[in-house]
Amino acid sequence: TVQVLPGEYRLRNAVHLRDKVRILGSGEDSVLIKEASVKVKLADDSDWYDQEITLENATGFKVGDGVCLRAKNPHDGGNTVIKRTLVARSGNRFKLNAGLRKNLWLSGNPTAATLFPLLNCEHVKHVAIENITLDGNRANNENLNGNYAGCIFAQDCSRLIFRNVEARNYNGDGMSWQICHDVVVENCHSHDHNGLGLHPGSGSQRPVMRGNKLERNNIGIFFCWGVRHGIAENNINIENDIGISIGHRDTDNFILNNDVLRSKKGGIVFRPDNRGKDFGPHRNRV
């Protein structure tokens, strides 16, 4: 257990959690807040095997910073997104904690920005985050969508617990977990995000979301692709654009006893998907 004592802690990088770690705060008195983001263009090409980048202007960047590198893929025009940490510096050139594994060529207009989740879980299990306040400092940060970040972000994990957490003001999602199984979110308050309040991400099995309050988000609870055998129960959704959204291959979920109030565009939305006979949201009970 890592106990976070009362205070405001300003983050220049994510807190990366490991197996069997419990983060225990002091409620509203323990606040992790993201520092303002800085964005700059890259000044030189970097190939997929490189572990360095060169910035046009390194003002606002320090060794230890979490960064998000983005560009257009030079081969197919798609989006390239890479999350790394700056670990060494020589002038405007920085070494990264790991190789790029994708090409960042000037033809794709690559940029670096100090964007990251506040608490980050990747390939871990049996993690708990409890009784803490997370502030994304939305007014001073660029958007980074919930496939990559949030106040809490998890990727390829299992058996996570988020309990009595206030997640607020992220320019993206509040809590997002991608291909994560048996995630429990209880008695949390996720509000005032540009993106989603709770985002059980693609392929996530058996999420339990119970007793949460979701306010003034783009969507309160968003079932991404292929979320199955989940429970969303006794949650309060207030003044979101959409209260609850469910769609592509989201099957066998129970959505029970939720209050969905004053939604701006829709209370509960079943997203249409006509690309295949099994692509719709089937056998869900509301």
Regions found by a protein language model. Give the residues of each.
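N-terminal extracellular ligand-recognition/capping segment immediately after the signal peptide
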Residues: 1-22, 26-38, 69-85, 98-109, ...
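Acidic Gly/Asp/Thr-rich repetitive segments characteristic of extracellular carbohydrate-active
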Residues: 1-4, 59-64
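Extracellular beta-strand solenoid repeats
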Residues: 3, 10, 16, 24, ...
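The right-handed parallel beta-helix/beta-solenoid scaffold, focusing on the short coil/turn
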Residues: 7, 13, 19-21, 29, ...
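Short alpha-helix capping/helix-loop boundary micro-motifs
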Residues: 50-58
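Right-handed parallel beta-helix
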Residues: 65-102, 122-215
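Consensus "Asn ladder" position of solenoid repeat domains
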Residues: 132, 165, 188, 193, ...
